[in-house]
Every structure is written in C-alpha cells, then in structure tokens.
Regions:
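Conserved phosphate/anionic-ligand binding catalytic regions in large, soluble enzymes, centered on
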Residues: 1-17
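Long, Pro/Ser/Thr-rich low-complexity/intrinsically disordered regulatory tracts in eukaryotic proteins
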Residues: 11, 23-25, 30-189
C-alpha cells in the first residue's frame, strides 16, 4: 500500500499479548504508553482502531525505514519480554495485595462460563480472559480446551457453521453460552 510506515523493508511484525493483570492493576496504559517512542504501535484484538477485547493487545513495529529486518525482530522480541515481565509482576501483586478480589473475579468468570444461558461476544472475551488468568495463577482448575480455541469457536461465524444456520441476537448469545457450558464440563486435572 502507499502507507508511509511501509517505506523501507516493509516488514510488519506483530505479537498478541494477554495482559489481564496489568489491566486489573491499572498499569496497562503506563506500560503500553511507553511503546510509541520506541517505534511500536499498540492496537486492540482486531487491529487498527479496535479495542482490546479480552485484555488482548496487538503490538507491532511502525518504523521500517532505516532498520534491518533482524533489528525489527530483535526489538519487538525484547520489548515483548519486558511487557511479559510487567504482566508477571502485576500477577504477583494481585496474589499478594488483592488475593480475595482476584479469586472472586476469576471464580465469578468460571461460574458464568459454566452456567450462563446468554453470552455476548464482548462478555465472553472478558470472562474467558479472567478465567485464563485464574488458571494461570493456579486459582482455578484447568479446562481441556485452550483459551484461543475457545475465543475463536465462540465467534459468530464458528457458531453458525457448527449449528448449520444463521444466528443472531439472543439465539446467537444462547448458542455461544451453550457451547461454552459444554466446553467447561470437560475438565482436566
């Protein structure tokens, strides 16, 4: 395309990161806000102009002129590791400073996933994020289905394909909740 940020190598590299603890501790803006001066852009789950549903952020390089492909990859990898370190520190802070609030949040998410009858896509992404945080912090028991698989398979297109008919409104939200209830009945130890 004719976008000025594509001048140079034209290499666009991005990574998706799940940052629920940074969001819960109100540190996400501070951490991600420091990326623009480094030539990195932060977007939501669906790219430019989108929100970060499910606490998932896309981080990508903006500058391709005057940087080698190797430098671009090395820079993004180093920054990603720092962001992950910040997320892990925030999780530790939640464990030590707000254990009951954290436990309540993740257990409420699990209860909703196991029992809800209607779930919007936005609510699903939010509670799946909380549930994953609970599993990774070893507060909640693991489930057999993976986080990304659950996110993708709870989207409208996948639900319509599985049900072999168009879905919208409450019927779509019902089928999404039904799918997730079934997935959460399959627990792994």
């Amino acid at each position: 395309t004719s976008c000025p940020t594509n001048v140079g190598t034209g290499l666009r590299v991005s990574v998706m990161v799940h940052l629920p603890a940074l969001v819960m501790t109100n540190q996400v803006q501070q951490v991600l806000g420091a990326l623009a001066p480094l030539g990195l852009a932060v977007r939501g789950l669906y790219g430019e102009g989108s929100r970060a549903f499910g606490n998932i952020y896309q981080i990508s390089n903006q500058i391709t002129l005057g940087k080698s492909e190797e430098d671009t990859l090395t820079n993004l990898e180093a920054v990603t590791k720092q962001i992950i370190d910040c997320e892990m520190q925030a999780r530790e802070a939640l464990k030590t400073q707000s254990p009951l609030i954290t436990q309540d949040k993740v257990w409420r998410a699990r209860g909703t996933l196991e029992n809800a009858r209607l779930l919007t896509a936005e609510e699903t992404f939010s509670i799946l994020s909380d549930d994953r945080l609970g599993m990774e912090m070893e507060v909640l028991p693991k489930v057999s289905a993976g986080f990304v698989s659950l996110l993708i398979n709870s989207l409208q297109g996948c639900l319509q394909y599985r049900n072999e008919k168009p879905l919208d409104g409450n019927l779509l939200n019902y089928e999404r909740a039904n799918f997730l209830r079934q997935m959460y009945q399959r627990k792994d130890g």
